[in-house]
């Protein structure tokens, strides 16, 4: 019953995002890589998770888990039910960062797809903020490949200071998957986790340069 509710929610979301926001999806071939995958989008709007969910093919959604901030996704019984139905697990970077990382690592160890927003919070101005080193730790410990993912248009549609969205186009671009070693070689920082996180951010930014 719970899983059926999740599929219904995801189906309605796909129709809404494609109809209202004219969702465009690029780079789906990046999701065919073997092994566990960590999908790492930039985060500028509440619409971001909805856009990624609508962009992912059904074959991927079956095995996809999501990191959801407890202050939003687990605030109240209805939201908790919705989160369980759509395979969202709680993350609280302020009170229990280790707990969220442990749940994420468990999902990747089981070779699932994991959607993780490395900035931690929505950007106040639409610019891509520094990525937190936790994502580097996840990639390093799990052996998962990271898929840099760029969301364009969500900030213009629903920035932090706006209550109701503008129905403008949103584009989701999935980039080439990278290993921890590749990302560490691309990035800068005082630790391996920081270098991996920075390399991943640069890979997301590069998707905008190539648009």
Segments and roles (model prediction):
Residues 4-8, 98-211:
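Non-catalytic C-terminal accessory region of glycerolipid acyltransferases
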Residues 33-94:
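Catalytic core of membrane glycerolipid acyltransferases/transacylases, capturing the structured
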């Amino acid at each position: 019953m719970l899983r059926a509710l999740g599929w219904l929610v995801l189906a309605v979301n796909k129709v809404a995002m494609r109809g209202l926001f004219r969702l465009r999806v690029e780079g789906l071939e990046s999701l065919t890589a073997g092994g566990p995958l960590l999908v790492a989008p930039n985060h500028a709007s509440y619409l971001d998770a909805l856009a990624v969910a609508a962009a992912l093919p059904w074959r991927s959604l079956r095995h996809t888990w999501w990191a959801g901030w407890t202050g939003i996704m687990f605030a109240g019984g209805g939201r908790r039910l919705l989160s369980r139905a759509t395979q969202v697990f709680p993350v609280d970077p302020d009170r229990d960062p280790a707990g969220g990382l442990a749940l994420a690592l468990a999902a990747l160890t089981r070779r699932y797809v994991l959607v993780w927003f490395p900035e931690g919070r929505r950007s106040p101005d639409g610019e891509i903020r520094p990525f937190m080193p936790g994502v580097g730790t996840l990639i390093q410990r799990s052996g998962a490949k990271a898929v840099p993912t760029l969301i364009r248009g969500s900030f213009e549609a629903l920035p932090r200071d706006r209550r109701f969205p503008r129905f403008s186009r949103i584009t989701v671009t999935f980039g080439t998957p990278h290993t921890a070693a590749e990302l560490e070689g691309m990035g800068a920082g005082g630790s391996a986790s920081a270098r991996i996180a920075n390399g991943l951010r640069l890979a997301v930014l590069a998707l905008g340069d190539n648009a």
